[in-house]
Amino acid sequence: MTKEFQDSMASLQGTGYYRWMQSEGIPVVEGFSVEDVRAIELGPWRRLGGKGAFVSLCGMEGQTGMYVAEITPGGALNPERHMYEEMICILTGHGATEVWQEGGKKQLFEWEPWSLFAPPLNTWHRLVNGGNEPVRLIAVTTAPIALDFYRNPEFIFNCPLISPSASAAKTAISKPAGNFMPSACNRSGKPTSSPMPKGSK
């Protein structure tokens, strides 16, 4: 363990985000890198449901949060909303995400391996495993900034505010503008026709 890594972890331990990670009761993977996040050992995650682990790498502290979660076949994570941004990448499995505002109608979109999406800020969302194999996902968040700024998890996870971005996303989800898969690609990812406009070089 290098001095750089020790100093990095020491600076993280005094933050509201670090205390919150510890209170969640799941493993925290620390280091300079992770060879394969699909192989990380997970623990039961009472708040979110399923299993999970935080990933805290040198250089991320204070700015970026990361976690890996797993959903059993036919299972689902608990609904949540939060006052920080989150980008989710599906590593394995198939399923769907429900998204809704407080008192509003639920919208649903499906995903598969390597789907990438971001629930609108502070909207309720729930991930559901619709397949016969475990779903494993990785998420990158701005939770460290939010938790260190507000220092109040109750406010972060139970704020009634509906943000302008969430209102705009309602229309985007209910009235999609295009196809889930690019028209120039099939399910194998191989081009079926040239995606370049005529005359392009």
Mark where each language-model region is.
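Histidine-centered metal-chelating micro-motifs
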Residues: 76-78, 96, 115-127
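Ligand-binding loop in jelly-roll beta-barrel domains
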Residues: 110-113, 121-150
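Short histidine-centered beta-strand/loop micro-motifs
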Residues: 55-59, 76-82, 99, 108-109, ...
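His/acidic/aromatic-lined binding-pocket segments of jelly-roll/cupin-type domains
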Residues: 68-69, 79-81, 85-90, 108-109, ...
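Conserved short histidine dyad/triad with adjacent acidic residue
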Residues: 48-54, 65-82, 201
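Short acidic-glycine-tyrosine-enriched beta hairpin
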Residues: 60, 101-121
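Glycine- and acidic-residue-biased ligand/ion/polar-headgroup-sensing regions
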Residues: 72-73, 83-102
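A short, N-terminal "cap"/entry segment at the start of jelly-roll beta-barrel domains
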Residues: 1-62, 155-201
